[in-house]
């Protein structure tokens, strides 16, 4: 890509396909969501292909011994869940984590198959953000 992604998106110079985009609670210091909201809103105005937004906020087990130092859901912390590889990590995952992982694998698989992860698309009129957490 030869230009800034946000500039290309605003000008309609990105692929005209469905998008599923999201962030974790601590992506970019917790500031990642606003630019994603803008992208999804602009996308809904430019294309009939939807944009689906997610927000991963599961604080990973093993990082919560001292709540004052809890890093939150750091960048890439959702990857074990979305690829169904919790058993490859040292973390003390619970049954709820495995259920969350299963739901995320289902959503990504559904999106790859059909272009729809199983929740409403984000639009200016209906700003849906799917939250992934164990609670």
Outline where the language-model segments fall.
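C-terminal helix-and-tail extensions that cap enzymatic domains
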Residues: 4-135
